[in-house]
UniProtKB/Swiss-Prot annotation:
Listed GO biological process terms: translation
InterPro entries: Ribosomal_bL32, Ribosomal_bL32_bact, Ribosomal_zn-bd
GO CC terms of this entry: large ribosomal subunit
Family: Belongs to the bacterial ribosomal protein bL32 family.
UniProt signal peptide: none
Name of the protein in question: Large ribosomal subunit protein bL32
Keywords: Ribonucleoprotein, Ribosomal protein
Originating organism: Rickettsia typhi (strain ATCC VR-144 / Wilmington)
């Protein structure tokens, strides 16, 4: 079984982990709804992309009746 010959120092361990940090999420404010959304993604509130309606909202039959 493989066993390390020398103890890995805290410095070496942290240098190895330096690339594991998460980056910030880039969000923009939707011009039509004012909600936050990811750039180049469909707005989850009204289903628009680039000021065009691309996804129709589902209508609940219970609310209509």
């Amino acid at each position: 079984m493989a066993v390390p010959k020398k103890k890995t120092s805290k410095s070496k361990r942290n240098m190895r982990r330096s690339h594991l940090a998460l980056g910030k999420v880039n969000v923009v404010v939707d011009a039509q709804t004012g909600e936050y959304k990811l750039p180049h993604h469909i707005s989850l509130v009204d289903g628009t992309y680039n000021n065009r309606q691309v996804v129709m909202k589902k209508i609940d039959t219970e609310e209509v009746a």
